[in-house]
């Protein structure tokens, strides 16, 4: 059975939650063994897949979980706004570390390596390719190039203003166009994740609301301070 077919079964049985285990950089939680522990806890709680950033984190996680891992490498480049899995060597390193799916930036922006080249390299390793997109045009272009999974990950992050709510319209548009969509980006409540599934998402990735303790504390602190002003 193919990995996509296996995931279809898991999603039907468990609901389609993917947990992104990416601690705040330099946080006390930003250690491979802690990332792996969070991933294992998520798997035991019913997550159908895990999203991991960084080769060391992926290696540690691969050793303890059996669910599929979506791997990425983030870089801050001087000559490109693209941050997610920008280089061939990133793809190779993630494949060697045990990723099942490799996600890349799929936006139409200046980049060191073309999207189609990165997709070809992912497929060279026999792995599934996911593209993190920001618009319908991004997603449809990446689907035509052969990406098996389209993520709404970068919606709201390629423009000056980032909205508070997730982009359900993008999920619906891409799903209706025939894309296998992972909804991602600002899904901070179970209700929002459920809405994404109703709008046609294949699965939903949740990160900050589950694995970024600093963000969760900030949400509570902000709300509670407002309550006593």
Swiss-Prot record:
Keywords: Carbohydrate metabolism, Isomerase
Functional summary from the UniProt entry: Converts N-acetylmannosamine-6-phosphate (ManNAc-6-P) to N-acetylglucosamine-6-phosphate (GlcNAc-6-P).
Annotated Pfam families: NanE (PF04131)
GO terms of biological process kind: carbohydrate metabolic process; N-acetylmannosamine catabolic process; N-acetylneuraminate catabolic process
UniProt GO molecular function: N-acylglucosamine-6-phosphate 2-epimerase activity
Keyword Iron-sulfur part of the UniProt annotation: no
GO cellular component: cytosol
Species the sequence originates in: Shigella flexneri
Catalytic activity field: an N-acyl-D-glucosamine 6-phosphate = an N-acyl-D-mannosamine 6-phosphate
Protein name per Swiss-Prot or TrEMBL: Putative N-acetylmannosamine-6-phosphate 2-epimerase
Classification lineage: Bacteria, Pseudomonadati, Pseudomonadota, Gammaproteobacteria, Enterobacterales
EC numbers for this chain: 5.1.3.9
Biological pathway: Amino-sugar metabolism; N-acetylneuraminate degradation; D-fructose 6-phosphate from N-acetylneuraminate: step 3/5
Keyword Isomerase listed: yes
Family: Belongs to the NanE family.
């Amino acid at each position: 059975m193919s990995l996509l077919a296996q995931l279809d079964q898991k999603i039907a049985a468990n609901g389609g939650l993917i947990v992104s285990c990416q601690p705040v950089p330099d946080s006390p939680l930003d250690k491979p063994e802690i990332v792996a522990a969070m991933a294992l806890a998520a798997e035991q709680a019913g997550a159908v897949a895990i999203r991991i950033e960084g080769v060391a984190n992926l290696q540690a996680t691969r050793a303890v979980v059996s669910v599929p891992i979506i791997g990425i490498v983030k870089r801050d480049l001087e000559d490109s706004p693209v941050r997610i899995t920008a280089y061939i060597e990133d793809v190779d390193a993630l494949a060697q570390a045990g990723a099942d799916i490799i996600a890349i930036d799929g936006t139409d922006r200046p980049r060191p390596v073309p999207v189609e080249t990165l997709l070809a390299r992912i497929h060279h390793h026999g792995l599934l390719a996911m593209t993190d997109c920001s618009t319908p045009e991004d997603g449809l272009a990446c689907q035509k190039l052969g990406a098996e999974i389209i993520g709404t990950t970068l919606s709201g992050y390629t423009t000056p203003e980032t909205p508070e709510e997730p982009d359900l319209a993008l999920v619906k548009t891409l799903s209706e166009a025939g894309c296998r969509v992972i909804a991602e980006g600002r899904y901070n409540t179970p209700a929002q994740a459920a809405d994404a599934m109703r709008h046609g998402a294949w699965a939903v990735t949740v990160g900050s609301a589950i694995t970024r303790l600093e963000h969760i504390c900030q949400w509570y602190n902000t709300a509670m301070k407002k309550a006593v002003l």
